[in-house]
Each structure stands twice: as structure tokens, then as C-alpha cells.
């Protein structure tokens, strides 16, 4: 099963199709006892955030940093909570993509790093700051913070 909404594809579609795509992919992962992979959690997080579904966004992020995904003594990321394969770089990159593409709503386009979707923050989060993000030779600090009304807003500052 492939996400049509995954950032590298991000095919044009109306919100109803995007929501159905997410539901079809997420439903099996929400079943009790389902073993999630650290890489599989990234597209779920991004798709939920793209839809503005903060509850599922928070769930997938939490699952990606808990459920024994990080193994002692150095907190290395494994592919699943039940193995000890050592450092799983793809899963770690997926987690970073969850933050970069999911929570910020940014996408890489020909015009540069553009805000394609509204930013989101999981319930209870006040802000998220990604520092020294380098894109096409430029350096940025990217922050998603709640405004006075509680709505997440994206701020990009050159370094």
C-alpha cells in the first residue's frame, strides 16, 4: 500500500480523497497488537498533519519515539520495537521528515522550500523549533508556534 500523499509524491487531490487515502493506510496500523515500523510511522505522521488531524499526528509521533523504538545504551533507533538491529538510519530520517514535512507543512518545490499546508502542533505543544536547517545553501531556523488564539503559525528566519 502506498500513500498517494507522501511528500515525495504529494499528488494533487481534493481533501476527501486525501482523507480516504490516509484512513485506508492508517486503519490497519491502529489495530491492537499491530507492530509498527519506525519508517512506517513517518508517512502516517505526515499524512495526519497534512489533514490537520492533531490527535493522530501526536499518536504517530509518540509511537515513533516510544514503544521501545530507541534502544539503550545510546538510544539508537531500531526498525521495530521488537528487534535490536542497531541503528536504523532510514527510520531516523523518517522521524526528521515527520517534523519537517508534517508539523511545518513545508515542501520542496522548484521555487524553494514552500509552505504547502498549514502547520500543526500536537495537543499540549506550545512550539517546535528546527535550528540551522540548510536548504540550497541557505540556513534557516524554522519555528512553529501558537499565536494568541492558539493557532500554530510558521516562522522562517534566515541565519
Named regions from a protein language model:
Residues 1-98, 102:
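Active-site core of glycosidic bond-cleaving carbohydrate-active enzymes
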Residues 55-159:
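Non-catalytic C-terminal accessory modules of carbohydrate-active enzymes
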Amino acid at each position: 500500500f502506498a500513500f498517494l500523499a507522501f511528500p515525495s509524491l504529494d499528488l494533487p487531490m481534493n481533501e476527501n480523497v486525501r482523507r480516504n487515502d490516509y484512513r485506508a493506510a492508517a486503519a490497519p496500523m491502529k489495530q491492537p497488537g499491530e507492530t509498527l515500523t519506525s519508517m512506517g510511522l513517518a508517512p502516517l505522521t505526515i499524512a495526519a498533519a497534512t489533514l490537520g488531524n492533531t490527535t493522530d499526528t501526536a499518536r504517530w509521533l509518540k509511537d515513533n519515539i516510544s514503544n521501545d523504538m530507541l534502544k539503550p545504551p545510546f538510544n539508537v533507533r531500531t526498525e521495530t520495537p521488537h528487534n535490536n538491529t542497531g541503528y536504523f538510519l532510514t527510520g531516523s530520517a523518517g522521524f526528521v521528515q515527520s517534523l519537517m514535512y508534517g508539523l511545518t507543512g513545508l515542501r520542496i518545490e522548484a521555487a524553494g522550500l514552500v509552505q504547502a499546508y498549514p502547520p500543526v502542533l500536537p495537543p499540549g505543544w506550545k512550539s517546535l523549533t528546527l535550528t540551522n536547517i540548510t536548504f540550497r545553501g541557505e540556513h534557516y531556523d524554522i519555528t512553529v508556534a501558537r499565536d494568541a488564539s492558539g493557532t500554530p503559525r510558521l516562522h522562517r528566519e534566515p541565519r
